Structure formats: C-alpha cells, structure tokens
C-alpha cells in the first residue's frame, strides 16, 4: 500500500471518530455541539450542546431541513420532520432544532438510567459466587418441609 493512501485512510478514520455526523463536533470536555451556517450569510445558527452525538445530529438535521428543504443532506434521512419545510425565521428554526435535540437527549438519558438500574439489580442478585434462589411468593408453603425451612435445612 502506498504511504500517502495509508495516511489519508488514518485521517479519514480519525475524522469519522471525532465527527461521526455532519454539522456537529465534540468539545474538549465531552459535550457534543451543533451549529449550521445560514444560507447566503456568514453567520451561524447555534443549535445547542448535547450529551450524545445523535442528539446533536438530530438538531442539525432539523435545522438543515427547515433551512434548505427536503433535498438537504441529512444524517438521519429516515427521520424527516413531519411538517413541511416552510419559510421560518432563524429563531424559530433554532427553537425547533433544540427541542428535537433535547428530546433525543432525554430519551438517551432514560435508556442510560434504565441500564444502570438493571446492572445494579443484577449485581445485588449475584452474591456469594452464585445467584440467589428466587422464591415464589404466591406458592403456599409445603407442610412436609416446613420444619426444614425454619431450621435452615
């Protein structure tokens, strides 16, 4: 393989890791931010700061859809906004984009919390080198083994 091709491939992989989606970037402290340049202007629309790259990318997609229409290149084309791309002010576009990004962030945070709860629950059950025996609380006690259960077998 040519050395120049290898360097270009390494740069492409690094860029993909740093910017997995169009219109977003990662801050030094780990937050993902989204912004977009307004058409025919030098100014940028700030779309917010998010916990996940997906949330930032969805905010970007919403803004680019309303700015450039349905022919715009989107990160998630299968998730087009339900409304039509009418002419809106920059403030309205920013508001819609931040709402979408915040919703995606909230869903992501809920999933993370649920996964943490599952891990804590499974750690509590796994104790002493094996899983605890789960007891059916709806089952009536067996009178023959009642004395054994009280003594501890």
From Swiss-Prot:
Gene3D superfamilies from the UniProt entry: AP2/ERF domain
CDD domains reported in the protein's UniProt record: AP2
Entry keyword set: Activator, DNA-binding, Ethylene signaling pathway, Nucleus, Transcription, Transcription regulation
Subcellular location: Nucleus
Function: Probably acts as a transcriptional activator. Binds to the GCC-box pathogenesis-related promoter element. May be involved in the regulation of gene expression by stress factors and by components of stress signal transduction pathways.
Family: Belongs to the AP2/ERF transcription factor family. ERF subfamily.
Family matches, as PANTHER family: ETHYLENE-RESPONSIVE TRANSCRIPTION FACTOR ERF011, ETHYLENE-RESPONSIVE TRANSCRIPTION FACTOR RAP2-1-RELATED
Stated name of the protein: Ethylene-responsive transcription factor ERF011
């Amino acid at each position: 393989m040519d050395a120049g091709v290898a360097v270009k491939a390494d740069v492409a992989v690094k860029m993909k890791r740093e910017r997995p989606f169009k219109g977003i970037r990662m801050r030094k402290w780990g937050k993902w931010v989204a912004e977009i340049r307004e058409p025919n202007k030098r100014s940028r629309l700030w779309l917010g700061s998010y916990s996940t790259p997906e949330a930032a990318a969805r905010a970007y997609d919403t803004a680019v859809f309303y700015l450039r229409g349905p022919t715009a290149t989107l990160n998630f084309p299968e998730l087009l906004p339900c409304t039509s791309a009418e002419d809106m002010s920059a403030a309205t576009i920013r508001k819609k984009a931040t709402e979408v990004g915040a919703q995606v962030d909230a869903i992501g945070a809920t999933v993370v919390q649920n996964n943490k709860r599952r891990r804590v629950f499974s750690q509590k059950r796994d104790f002493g080198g094996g899983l605890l025996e789960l007891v059916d609380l709806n089952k009536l006690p067996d009178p023959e083994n009642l004395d054994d259960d009280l003594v501890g077998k």
